[in-house]
């Protein structure tokens, strides 16, 4: 796998993708066997992160000139679904941390060079909610504050942190993402005590007066206008995919994967299960069968939508076409709906799985708790995305761009 990540142009992209997925498949038994350990530890074990790194997970969408693979997002997302089917927490960290190189490719070249020139395996966590304080200073910005829910931060040398630059003589207020090195932030190890996604280590990070040069910032205004400075060196259509939708899908695929894992656990538990009161195997009970059929259908549909959407989006851009606004908001809604449908389907399985469901070491209940945690991410806001999608179909004008918000379609 290492040879695939050396920045050379792939001679057989399909073969490269198959190798990537095969490397992930080889890791799944170990990831699955240690899902309980991951949750108890409160973060993904170091050796699992090392194995994911060797498999190319954290270079999958990284620019080739910095040692990345630039795999199609449809392939990357399929890999993340598979990882999450073994462990929801590991899948979440792999997906979120794994997609950050794609956004970092939109930063100025100087930032990319600083991160990857000496270490192509450098990783970044994130916390985009603008909870910190920032002000302009000579050559850049002064950044301070506390950011929550920085998934996988224990394994990262950088953090992508959101803040709103206040209006001043140089311009109006605007949202930016700040790329902060590990030396400039602290991790609050007591900030992650949760009932779902416990193994993600989504801890608070604290910055006390870091100086961030301008080149280590990413402006939402550039996302809106398609003027990201990274396009100067990463000019392929691949990097012009809609960042908001890239991230929304990044959050959805661990939910799809966790639901896959829950379905697999349900099938394994009920194939041979017999009621303590006697009678035929529970597998012959329609009450056990019907929720399974629903869950299988919901998971397959969500998985198929991810594959079809991102194959279509990339094909459009490579053909020199725009992605219509209606298709963008449709994607936003479908990714939020994946959370809703997968969580609901797994909940239905819980109700007919018997008392063993609530054992603390049970995979099914762990997947469900992880799904509930994922369902509370802002990217899973079904009402917001449904409104946007329905308005587009009804001919309602889209809302105006707001430079202080992160939502750009």
Predicted regions and their residues:
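C-terminal helix-coil-helix/basic helical segment that borders enzyme active sites and/or dimer interfaces
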Residues: 32, 36-39, 301-337, 347-358
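Short segments within alpha-helical structural elements
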Residues: 344-351, 382-386
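Glycine-rich phosphate/cofactor-binding loops in nucleotide/flavin-utilizing enzymes
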Residues: 355-409
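Glycine-rich flavin
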Residues: 44-54, 58-156, 167-172
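Glycine-rich beta->alpha junctions and the first turn(s) of the following alpha-helix
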Residues: 195, 202-299
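Generic structural signal for well-ordered, non-transmembrane alpha-helical segments
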Residues: 257, 293-300, 332, 336-343, ...
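DPxDG-like acidic metal-binding loop motif
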Residues: 146-192, 201, 354
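Basic/polar N-terminal segments that are highly enriched at the extreme N-terminus
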Residues: 1-26, 404-409
């Amino acid at each position: 796998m290492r040879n695939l990540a050396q920045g050379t142009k792939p001679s057989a992209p399909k073969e490269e993708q198959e190798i990537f997925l095969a490397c992930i498949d080889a890791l799944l038994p170990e990831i699955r066997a240690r899902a309980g350990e991951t949750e108890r530890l409160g973060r993904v074990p170091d050796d699992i992160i090392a194995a994911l790194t060797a498999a190319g997970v954290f270079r999958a969408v990284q620019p080739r000139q910095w040692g990345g693979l630039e795999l199609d997002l449809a392939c990357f997302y399929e890999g993340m679904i598979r990882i999450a089917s073994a462990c929801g927490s590991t899948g979440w960290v792999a997906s979120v941390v794994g997609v950050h190189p794609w956004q970092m490719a939109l930063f100025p070249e100087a930032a990319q060079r600083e991160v990857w020139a000496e270490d192509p395996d450098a990783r970044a966590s994130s916390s985009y909610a603008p909870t910190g304080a920032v002000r302009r200073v000579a050559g850049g910005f002064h950044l301070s504050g506390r950011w929550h829910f920085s998934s996988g931060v224990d394994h990262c040398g950088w953090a992508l942190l959101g803040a709103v630059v206040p209006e001043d003589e140089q311009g109006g207020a605007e949202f930016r993402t700040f790329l902060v090195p590990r030396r400039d932030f602290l991790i609050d190890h007591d900030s992650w005590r949760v009932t779902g996604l416990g193994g993600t280590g989504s801890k608070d990070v604290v910055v006390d007066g870091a100086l961030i040069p301008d080149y280590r910032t990413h402006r939402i205004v550039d996302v809106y206008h398609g003027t990201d400075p990274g396009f100067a060196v990463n000019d392929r259509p691949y990097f012009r995919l809609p960042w908001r939708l890239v991230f929304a899908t990044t959050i959805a695929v661990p939910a799809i994967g966790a639901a896959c894992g829950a379905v697999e656990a349900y099938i394994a538990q009920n194939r041979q299960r017999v009621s303590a009161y006697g009678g035929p195997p529970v597998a012959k009970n329609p009450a056990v069968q019907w929720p399974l059929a629903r869950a299988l259908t919901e998971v397959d549909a969500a998985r198929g939508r991810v594959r079809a959407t991102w194959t279509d989006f990339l094909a459009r851009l490579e053909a020199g076409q725009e992605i219509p606004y209606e298709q963008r908001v449709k994607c936003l809604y479908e990714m939020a709906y994946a959370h809703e449908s997968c969580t609901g389907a797994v909940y239905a399985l819980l109700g007919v799985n018997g008392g063993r469901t609530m054992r603390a070491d049970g995979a099914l209940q762990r997947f469900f708790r992880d799904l509930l945690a994922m369902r509370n991410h802002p990217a899973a806001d079904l009402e917001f995305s449904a409104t946007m999608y329905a308005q587009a179909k009804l001919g309602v004008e889209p809302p105006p761009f707001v430079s202080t918000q992160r939502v750009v379609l």
